């Protein structure tokens, strides 16, 4: 599972076996875990919280969402590279 970047101790990463799903990232404090927060990336560069399974406090989660949205192009490029796809499927 490639780590994209770290925000205040939270890792933002992909799970390597989820390329059949629309583009999204996982967020966890410290090392990646199956019980991580999942964020859908929208086609317009926004974010939708699919779940907050890692219980990130809302004020921290909102800051993370802003940074993830600002990294839209990086995340899309890394998704294409990691999953070896040319077209990205978005949640919405």
Role assignments for model-derived ranges:
Residues 2, 13-15, 27-29, 63, ...:
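Short, flexible coil/linker segments at or flanking structured domains
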